[in-house]
Design a protein with these regions (language model features):
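Conserved ASCE P-loop NTPase core motifs with emphasis on AAA+ ATPases
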Residues: 1-14
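Conserved P-loop/Walker A NTP-binding site and adjacent catalytic elements of P-loop NTPases
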Residues: 13-15, 19-170
């Protein structure tokens, strides 16, 4: 097992080893800092492991620090990216007893109600849906337990109206 993965929560490290995953250079560089609770802006090429570089240490902290449900918010600019991130993270999350779910404009009312009753550990959403979450009392209460936020493709949001709206929400 790699040195950096061996520092992760035992369940997480074991799951990664079972899957045969090896850390990318980006992950080797970023994981120790984020595991220690430092904020980081991760800029690297597509396919370099940025998503897992940001998520693995947060899953580690979620497990080691017993974070409550709805402790990680993952914001992406596109619904299609939401679904991709949800698919990629769900398998790993389930292997260590965590839950991931997605919420955006296409999420059914029944699924939204389920998320409100039983929030996931990590919620993947869009900036617009994140803003709408402030309008409901139960949803605002859910947001109060958020300990970490990941904004994917921040460069696509930064120079637009969506970016400043997201900034206000955060």
């Amino acid at each position: 097992m790699s040195r950096v993965f061996s520092r992760l929560h035992p369940q997480l490290a074991e799951s990664l080893e079972e899957k045969g995953w090896q850390p990318t250079p980006v992950q080797e560089h970023v994981l120790p800092d984020v595991m220690a609770g430092h904020d980081r802006l991760i800029i690297a090429p597509t396919g370099s492991g940025k998503t897992m570089a940001g998520i693995l240490p947060l899953f580690h902290r979620c497990l080691t620090e017993s974070w409550p449900s709805m402790s990680i918010l993952y914001i992406t600019p596109l619904r299609a990216l939401n679904r991709d991130v949800d698919r990629r993270l769900t398998e790993l999350a389930e292997a260590v007893g965590l839950r991931v779910d997605v919420r955006h404009g296409d999420t059914s009312q029944s699924q939204r109600a389920k998320q409100t009753r039983n929030p996931p550990n990590l919620l993947v959403t869009t900036p617009e849906t994140f803003q709408l979450m402030f309008s409901g009392k139960n949803l605002r209460a859910m947001l109060s337990s958020v300990k970490a936020v990941v904004v994917d493709e921040v460069h696509d949001l930064a120079a637009s109206e969506r970016g400043w709206q997201l900034g206000v929400g955060l």
